[in-house]
């Protein structure tokens, strides 16, 4: 579904977010494509369109979107974080050769044998990241995806 400015404004308002120009631009960068983006990628997309948005504004807005559950944070490692506009239950493949993150349908992975939880807590979710790499080095050199 293409995201229009009016549609993004309505979505932000439904989630209790004041739709400033910069928040709308950041939302457009995230929701107009079916990709997982880092904060730096969001910043480049937003600033590439026309506006001069600071890195702090992007991080603050992404944190607000996380708090309001508009996006999910996918931490591949401490230095590699993606923001995922797909908030439905699902998991991920992370290609260590290309840095690409792709979705795995939740129904494709069966999680069994979780340990007993301590008293007073409940499971909020289970996030699985399957790290993959090419078994054919020539594909990595050529920049081709698996």
Question: Where are the language model's segments positioned?
Answer:
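Alpha-helix C-terminal capping/helix-coil junction sites
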Residues: 13, 66-67
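Short, Lys/Arg-enriched N-terminal segment that forms or immediately precedes the first helix
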Residues: 4-16
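DNA-recognition alpha helix
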Residues: 33, 38-50
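Pre-recognition alpha-helix immediately N-terminal to the DNA-recognition helix
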Residues: 24-29, 41
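Basic amphipathic alpha-helical segments that dock to polyanions
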Residues: 58-65
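Non-DNA-binding regulatory cores of transcription-related proteins
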Residues: 68-146
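Short helix-coil-helix linker/hinge
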Residues: 19-21
């Amino acid at each position: 579904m293409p995201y229009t400015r009016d549609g993004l404004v309505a979505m932000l308002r439904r989630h209790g977010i004041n739709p400033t120009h910069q928040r709308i631009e950041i939302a457009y960068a995230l929701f107009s494509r079916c990709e997982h983006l880092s904060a730096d990628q969001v910043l480049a997309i937003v600033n590439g369109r026309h506006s001069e948005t600071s890195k702090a504004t992007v991080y603050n807005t992404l944190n607000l979107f996380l708090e309001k559950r508009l996006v999910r944070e996918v931490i591949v490692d401490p230095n590699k974080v993606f923001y995922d506009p797909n908030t439905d239950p699902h998991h991920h493949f992370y290609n260590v050769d290309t840095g690409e993150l792709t979705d795995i349908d939740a129904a494709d992975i069966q999680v069994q044998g979780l340990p007993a939880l301590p008293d007073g807590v409940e499971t909020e979710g289970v996030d699985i990241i399957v790290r993959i790499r090419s078994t054919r080095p020539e594909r990595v050199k050529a920049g081709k995806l698996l």
